[in-house]
Amino acid sequence: MKRYDLRHLKDDFEPRMKEILGETHKANETLIFLFEIGDFTPIQRSADLVKECGYELYNSLKFNEVDWTIVVKK
């Protein structure tokens, strides 16, 4: 399991998330991403990106007032 905190990137987290998803990960490895949600549009964009990169979205939940967490697996 690997955790990636992308909150410091604010609304520009998608290029970094795509880069991470493009890296080689062990089979069935779980990845956890944290990012800022702002107006909630990043949630759908992140789900679309996960699917586009060939991963399965396991969980998506609000972490606190401004942060979101998603759990994905290859």
Residue ranges and their predicted role:
Residues K18-L21, D39-L57:
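Amphipathic alpha-helical interaction surfaces in cytosolic regulatory modules
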Residues M1-N28:
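An N-terminal amphipathic alpha-helical segment
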Residues L34-G38:
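Short helix-coil junctions and helix-kink-helix linkers
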Residues G54-K74:
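C-terminal edge-of-domain segments
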Residues D11, L31-F33, C53:
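Short non-domain terminal segments
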Residues K26, T41, L49, S60-E65:
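Long, contiguous binding/interaction regions
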Residues E29-F33, S46-L49:
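Amphipathic, hydrophobic secondary-structure cores in small proteins
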